[in-house]
């Protein structure tokens, strides 16, 4: 979709439209700025699975959020990750979804914890993994699943740290604007649906004649 294309374009081409591009040799990346490095995820942090947690310990309210394979699943009174990390859905239809953790959180064994090194900007890496569309790594015909090994070996484009930060700031703003426009459009759609329902109701109950506006 449009938002995904904006993200992928920014993390693979940068913000300077006049920069010289060269082939990366990687399908999802395409051409990249000449000065950028092509590397792998595994060189910029450690990746491990989260931990098991019983359903009884997951509540509707609590101190620490609990993240599973498809997102937030509840709250707990304990956490297993307190560093700046990225949680990656490992199991489920939405496997490959990513979220930046900046406060203590419990990550279940249906997700991966990517603890970042200081060699990469955390927000840039978040946008980079979104652009890489990790869901494509799922090769299971039954339960959707991706592994830490597959994520570690994903090729990524990496500019300088300052350029990473500029791209991350741009995408924070741009994607917030896109989300706002989507929300406004969705609200208009819901309003039209409600209007349609009212017209149908008025017509079938005889409260409105043909050609009359409700």
Residue ranges and their predicted role:
Residues 1-20, 158-214:
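Amphipathic alpha-helical coiled-coil/heptad-repeat segments
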Residues 23-52, 57-68, 165:
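Non-catalytic DNA-recognition/assembly elements of restriction-modification systems
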Residues 54-58, 137-142, 183:
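A short, aromatic/hydrophobic, helix- or strand-capping loop or linear motif
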